[in-house]
Amino acid sequence: MTTPRPLERRSATEQAHLDAMLHQVFEQNIAFHKALGFQLSSLDPAAPALSFNMRPDLIGHFVHGRLHGGVISTALDAAAGLAVIVGIAEKFAHETADQVAHRFSRVGTIDLRTDYLHQGIGKKFTATGRLTRLGGRIASAQMTLTNETGQLIATGSASYVIS
């Protein structure tokens, strides 16, 4: 009996191409992400993350200068979506960047829960996602939003259709 040969990972050049595509899509092509100033800060499959700076147009409570709750939810949704995308890229690591990118077009949020834990006060915020399940049709993720001091602002969980 022969042992199946493990599938090879995409080359470093292909991975760099995929990483560049993810930056382009998340930072430029998704207009709302661009308007909010989201920047990918990590594509680590264990903890993909995005960051953004506080700006006056992101304030939700004008007296206290707090980050708007909708921005918090959007950042958490984006971080969870990023975790799902990176998880798909890992699951299909034998595919080229263009092949795996085609799979991303089928990802969509079907459920999002946000728990606001502290006031959204800070100069810079980081949203981190963690893939908890990647099935054939549905993926689940958990996420956190922290400020530059590491204070936990919000947590969330989300489910995504992936096929």
Region locations from a protein language model:
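Terminal targeting signals and extreme-terminal segments of soluble enzymes
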Residues: M1-S163
